[in-house]
């Protein structure tokens, strides 16, 4: 198990080091899709929803189910796409892309892609690394499941490794001398001895960084589980703390049949979302920022309207955290059948489990801490690679000696 985990972690940690700068990579390599020229007239939420409808109409086989709204004037509109359902057969159409980019000012379609698609073009590198990091390029569901399980295994392995570094209980001295204090006997595990032989150096390189970085190991192992297996994570956290996540543990059961054309359309859902947020802000005592995203789950018959609020985590510049899936934004769930308010989910200050999870995930995806934290995460990934490589080398040396 440890051998397989080490091999997988090398890939996960190496790609994680790179995508710590995912946003910068996207801006550098995909400026034609990600960046636009700011216009003085600006754009409105209604404009964005009209563009969404236009994008969907351009390909009747597509269903634009998620719209992420730009937070800066030079950013493109980002949409997630899934196959539409053929009304005759009841099956999904074949679709060779799942992301769309458009100019929020004029609706111009800037590009499309399938996340993680293998390509020899540099513009596909960020998406490829991102997909490799969280799905190992296995079929979508299998890769995500495997990474989630590996997160748990990694946590257990890390705890076991930490325990193994603890010094053994000292034997009683016949001469009655007092044993060295615990911290002195443990100190050697935290050091890298450069004067020893190669095996000792490799062992220290495997052990010492793991001790120094153990808090980060625990954070990234837990969040790897949370990001990939959100449902089991939600059910686990709910046993020990108040926690709610509409996407991973929906507030209602899956419908018998997908609700394709709901009575409440996107425009009405956005209107209701803003109204409900104004009511909840007054009730819960938070202030409202910009709308972050709007999504529709046809399997649940629910809209999710996301908005930045004073309960958001903030980045190094004091702005609300923002990723391709703004999980740290507040979310309101709306029934697509009658427009009923279903629930509110705040990133902080509402439920202890949500507050802790928001912080952990924001650290994982480098949404907080600015450039300094990005560098820390990148270096941490390289340290994990070093620990795995030295561990595999030591295993191989022992096997040869046997």
For the regions a protein language model found, what residue spans apply to each?
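Conserved histidines in hydrophobic membrane contexts and catalytic metal-binding motifs
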Residues: 1-402
């Amino acid at each position: 198990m440890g051998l397989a985990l080490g091999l997988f972690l090398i890939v996960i940690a190496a790609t994680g080091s790179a995508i710590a700068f995912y946003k910068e990579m996207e801006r550098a390599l995909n400026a034609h899709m990600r960046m636009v020229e700011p216009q003085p007239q600006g754009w409105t939420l209604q404009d964005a929803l009209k563009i969404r409808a236009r994008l969907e109409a351009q390909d009747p086989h597509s269903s634009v189910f998620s719209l992420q709204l730009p937070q800066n004037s030079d950013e493109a509109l980002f949409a997630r796409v899934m196959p539409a359902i053929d009304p005759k057969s009841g099956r999904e159409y074949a679709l060779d892309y799942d992301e769309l980019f458009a100019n929020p000012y004029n609706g111009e379609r800037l590009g499309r892609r399938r996340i993680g698609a293998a390509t020899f073009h540099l513009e596909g590198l960020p998406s490829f690394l991102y997909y490799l990091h969280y799905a190992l390029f296995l079929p979508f569901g299998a890769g995500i499941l495997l990474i989630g399980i590996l997160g748990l295994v990694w946590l257990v392995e890390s705890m076991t490794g930490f325990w193994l570094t603890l010094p053994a209980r000292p034997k009683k001295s016949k001469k009655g001398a007092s044993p060295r204090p615990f911290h002195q006997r443990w100190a050697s595990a935290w050091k890298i001895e450069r004067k020893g032989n190669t095996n000792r150096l490799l062992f220290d390189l495997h052990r010492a960084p793991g001790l120094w970085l153990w808090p980060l190991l625990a954070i990234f192992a837990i969040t790897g589980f949370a990001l990939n297996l959100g449902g089991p994570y939600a059910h686990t956290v709910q046993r020990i703390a108040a926690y709610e996540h509409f996407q991973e543990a929906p507030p209602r059961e899956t419908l018998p049949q997908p609700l394709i054309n709901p009575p409440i359309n996107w425009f009405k859902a956005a209107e209701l979302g803003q109204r409900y947020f104004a009511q909840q802000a007054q009730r819960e005592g938070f202030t409202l920022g910009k709308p972050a995203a709007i999504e529709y789950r046809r399997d649940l018959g629910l809209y999710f309207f996301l908005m930045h609020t004073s309960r958001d985590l903030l980045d190094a510049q004091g702005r609300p955290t923002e990723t391709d899936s703004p999980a740290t934004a507040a979310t309101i769930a709306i029934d697509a059948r009658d427009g009923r308010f279903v629930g509110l989910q705040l990133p902080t200050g509402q439920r202890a489990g949500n507050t802790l999870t928001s912080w952990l995930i924001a650290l994982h995806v480098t949404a907080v801490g600015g450039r300094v934290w990005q560098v820390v995460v990148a270096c941490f990934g390289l340290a994990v690679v070093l620990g795995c490589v030295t561990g595999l080398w030591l295993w191989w040396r022992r096997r040869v000696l046997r």
